[in-house]
């Protein structure tokens, strides 16, 4: 949600490079919300305390994709680029399809805006120390445009940067019925990860920052 540590870290990093920064983020965590829009109920939007001084911050009772569209259409923020994240946990392979973090960036791309989605190792933002190096690399190599989302994943300690593609990763998913008579979704994280050459999963496994340029089609 809007008070997540990863958002604050990202804003602090962005402020070094961009003059006008705004935050529009979900009120609550939106893990695996994918590209869902809120259609069958109303949404509440609140201007809250700046996440850091001088950065107008809005909390929307919606999904990450909602936030991008709401910022553009209702708040009338004519942004040039969307930074989404920093997600607490890698978004690699099939995870990207389910990711609300990536969906926000993809929504921006659909509106002809530049977009970067960023993720780190679960429960560790140590990899954000490479933000400056990565952003410089992106700018110097002219990777940022309105045709692709840059999906960036930071390991805690990196050997370098690799341009990658989205690999295939299928987790064993099953369901457990508990005492409350409800079913809970479980994923077997011990499933071997795909090691295909130049894939995002392989890059992270080998200790590299992964940058995957991903188009809508």
Question: What is the predicted role of each segment?
Answer:
Residues 1-8, 194:
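Short acidic, Gly/Ser-rich segments with clustered Asp/Glu that frequently serve as metal-coordination loops
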Residues 11-78:
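A cross-family phosphate/adenosyl-ligand binding-site feature
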Residues 24-26, 84-87, 118-119, 152-153, ...:
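Short beta-strand segments
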Residues 29, 63-64, 87-90, 216:
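Short glycine-rich anion-binding loops that position phosphate/pyrophosphate groups of nucleotides
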Residues 81:
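Short, Asp-centered acidic motifs that coordinate Mg2+ and/or phosphate
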Residues 90-99:
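Glycine/threonine-rich flexible loop motifs
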Residues 109-128:
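Glycine-rich phosphate/pyrophosphate-binding loops
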Residues 128-217:
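Electrostatically charged, flexible surface regions
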